[in-house]
């Protein structure tokens, strides 16, 4: 996914109220939209280099959106995508390119399909002989050990519910896949069980029930973000 226009560089002053950040740019200090509800551990250090996209919508109160941060992570500095609204589009793009091996044989992705009393699945993949597949996408940008991506970075009750709902899909004879989009360089994925033991339990139970899980690292840079390759999920049973 290429950014539509060159990103605006800046330096992070502070992130606050979860969805707001103050950024110093060449044109002065601005308040921007921070499209991330998580803790952003290791990604919100004051003074960090950031890159912002500009909306063409004149009605937007905050025309700039925080997209990337150059974070000092274990293993060295790297660009990290912090926009949690991007992963679904990244998965759709990779699906069209045939880069999601777990969805080989499917020919269509329908977004936002209701499948449980209080849940919507991100995509319903169809067209395969094996039948439709419920696809849930999770954004990941936590790294506390070099090369190891983790999720979640805060309590994730909603994500735990998604795992339970997907396990029920499989129990009812359906198919389900969780795609973890890692918006940074990483070599493997694991659950941050110390941050949210309840999600860890739901994740393990869903896998044991037959929910497939695949993790993909992204190539991230000022020009764009794209799914690059699958990485192993090392969470034990």
Swiss-Prot record:
It holds the Pfam family SfsA. It comes from the Bacteria. GO terms for molecular function: DNA binding. InterPro entries: SfsA (IPR005224), SfsA_C (IPR040452), SfsA_N (IPR041465). Belongs to the SfsA family. This is Sugar fermentation stimulation protein homolog. It comes from Methylobacterium radiotolerans (strain ATCC 27329 / DSM 1819 / JCM 2831 / NBRC 15690 / NCIMB 10815 / 0-1).
